[in-house]
Amino acid sequence: KKHAVIGGLYMVIRGTETGVNLERFVLGALLDDVTRKADVRLSVMSGGRYQLQRARGERVDARKTGGLDLEVMDSYTGKSRVASTLSGGETFLASLSLALGLADVVQEYAGGVHLDSMFIDEGFGSLDQETLDLAMKTLIAMQGQNRMIGIISHVSELEERITTRLRIEKTQRGSIAAFEIDG
């Protein structure tokens, strides 16, 4: 009887019947937490249009992906679609939301560890004006939560919105770095 119990536990841990082993199950639970946090920001940045969710149903082959694929619920169409169908700007917003959600979850799970700094490299050039406004409002709100957000970008419109900048300029003799602070 003891061997049967141990054998049964082993099969559950390996995911023999469900196709999802214990590791993927735990990762899925963590991804759900990250997705919930990311949704708050993605909803703001997309004007309420998008929500992230784990893919379900026939689109998922749990043995290959472990049920860790994401879909996007589009409130305009009322349908879910695979994340790969998002435009470049929409993909940037979803990625930014996931990064921010991950930072939130790590902070919660780490018991007192604070992730006070984040650097974002590009992506803003793919956003239309309205979406850029929403993304910037989200990032500025994060500054009010004692977080430093560094944006690495060549988008000139951001220069007008960011009051403290570290400008890097290439010259023939090397790069020059200078802080600029608007009054």
PLM region spans:
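Terminal ABC-like ATPase head and other globular end-domains that cap long coiled-coil arms
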Residues: K1-G183
